[in-house]
Amino acid sequence: EYLSRVDAQYDARDKVENSSYVDEYVRHFLDAEPAPGIEWEKQFAHMLVPQIPLQAVNQVAALLPEENRALAFFLPEKEGMEYPTEQQVLDALAAVDAEQIDAYTEEVNNDPLVPELNSNVTIKKMQDGVYGTKLITLSNGIKVHVLHTDYSPNSIAMRAISWGGSSLYPNSEYNLVDNAHMVQVGGWGQFSAIDLQKKLSGKQVSVEPSIADRTEALHGSCVKKDLETMLQLTYLCFTSPRRDDDAYKSLLERTRNSLKNEDMNPITALRDSIASVVYNNNVRALRMRTEDVDGLDYDRVMEIYKERFANAADFEFFFVGDVEADSIAPLLTKYLGSLPVAKKHEKCKVVDERMAKGERTCIFDKEQDTPNALSLFIYHAPVANTLKNRIMVSMLQQSMQMLFTETVREDEGGAYGVPVSGSLTDYPEK
C-alpha cells in the first residue's frame, strides 16, 4: 500500500498544489526534513522497501523500553462511572508484560473476489454524450457514461445512481432504510470485512453503497491498475452482501454508545430542537436516537438493501478520470453485464420534507457547565435550482462570511467565528 501511494503521488506530480510545496519547504527549513522531490523518493522507496524483512519490523518493539512510558486515558465524566486507579493501570500493564504471547498468525482467504463470470452481454451502442462524455449502452439495458480527464492522473472515480431511496418506504421504516448501508459491516461475497481488507492490501480502491432520500448509489474510486478490482467490488455490492451477526451486533453497540455520548452534549439538544421546529417534527429530518438502535432489525436491513440494489438496469453508471471508453468496455460487459437486471424502472415518491412556513422565533434554555450562547438564523424561499443560482448562492455565502469575520470578529470582538452556509435543494412535487 505504501508503494502504491508513492506511485500515485509520482503520477500526479504535475498537479501538486502550491500549498503542498509550501508545507514541505517549511518542514525542510524548520525541522531539517529532507526535500529531495517525488522522483527521488519513488526510486528510493522501490529500492529500499522490498529489502525490509518482517523480522526488522518486529525489532522496532525492542525500542520501547519499560521505563519512560506514558499512558493516557480519555473517559467520559459522568455520575456512576468507575475509573481505574493508577495502580490498577500499572498492574494491568505489568500483567501483559509477563504474559507469554504467541506470535500472530495471519489467516488469508485466497479465494478470488468474485466467481468466474460468463456474461453474454455485449456493447449495444457507443456514442458521444454530453460534456465530452462517451455513452455506452450494454445489451442488458445498463447505461454507462465515461469521461476522460487529466485533472488527476492515474485516478478514476465511479458513481452508480438510481431513483428511489427512502422515499419508497413509510416513515416507520425510515431509520431502517437510512442505516441499510450498515450491511457492509459483514463484508461482501465470501469475505468478511477483515478478510476483505487483507485481500485488498496493496490496492488503492474502494466502493461504498449509500441510500439517500430519493436515490440509492454506489461511490467508488481507484487508481488505474485497480479498475478491475473496483468493478469486482461493484459486482459484489449488487449481488452478495454478506451476513455477519456478530459484526452487526458489535456495530449496533458502538452506535448505541456513540449516541449516548452525543446525548450528553448540550449542543445536541439544541440541534434536535431546531430540527424538530424547522421541519415540523418530521422523522426524516431528525437524527437517530439511542432508543432507535434497538429497532434496526438485521433481517429487515438486509432485505431493504437487497431491494434497493436488485435491478442494475435501473442505475446509470459514471466513470470519470484516467480512463477511456474503449479500454473499459470489456470490463463493463464482464462485470456490469453479469448483474441482475429487470425491465421495471422505479421513480422516487414525493415526500414532504419542506421547512415550516412563516416566521418563528424560538429560545431554548439549557444549563451548561460552561455558559455560552448560540444564535442561529435560518432563511428559506422558493428558487429555481439552476447552475446560475447555485453559483450566486455560493458567492453570497462567501461574501457574508468575509463580512461577518471582519465586523463581528475583528472589529467588535463579539465572537470567534460566525459560520455562514447556503444551499439549494430540490423538492419534487410529482
Model-found features: residue ranges?
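M16 family metallopeptidases and their MPP-like homologs
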Residues: 1-50, 69-76, 145-147, 152-240, ...
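Amphipathic alpha-helical segments in well-ordered regions
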Residues: 2-5, 335, 399, 403
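Proteolytic maturation boundary segments
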Residues: 11, 15-163, 168, 303, ...
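Peptidyl-prolyl cis-trans isomerase
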Residues: 52-60, 242-243, 248, 296
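Feature representing long, continuous alpha-helical segments
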Residues: 55, 177, 390, 394, ...
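Conserved short beta-strand edge segments in small beta-sheet-based binding/regulatory domains
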Residues: 244-250, 342-346
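Conserved alpha/beta enzyme-core scaffolds, especially Rossmann-like or related mixed alpha/beta domains
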Residues: 308-310
